[in-house]
Amino acid sequence: LTGVCVQTDIQFYDGVPVARFVNHVTNEGEEEQVLTYLSSFTCSGIKRDGNFLYIPHNGWQKELNWRRYSFEELGFPVTQTKSIRRSSKTIEVYNTGNWSTKEYLPMGFLSHPESDAGLIWQIENNGSWHYEIADQNDHYVLNVSGPNEIQSHFSKVLRPGETFESV
């Protein structure tokens, strides 16, 4: 196989319900490998009904403009039976280049008011970043990452023994 090894470090903080995730990719093989995407965090099994996504829109003279969206407003209508709910729809929020807050802040908030629960995330990077939410059967999946090949033409050649760290 490729000889690529991924190690995930999770840092917890006393008294605060926060965790920091960092992934390290090491080429333990004998040939160069090209990395085009590395997830920083993935959360699946997010309850489908009753969620709201808060997206922080940003601009040069209008910063921190949080907007609340229902998933129906974002194009996730319930059109299929419960056992096969999958719209193939993806909501993507991202930035390319070295101005990390050009259109959006590198964060988001998923709220479920009925259960008084929520999940907030922040991508710690001063360059390109990406997050997406998709539906899979009867739940949502959140993927958070730094730069990737599709949005920002990111690629990293890992020579044997080299390591790359996610944002």
Question: What are these language model-derived features?
Answer:
Residues 156-167:
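Short Pro-Gly-centered flexible turn/kink motifs
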Residues 1-136, 152:
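Polysaccharide-binding surfaces and accessory modules of carbohydrate-active proteins
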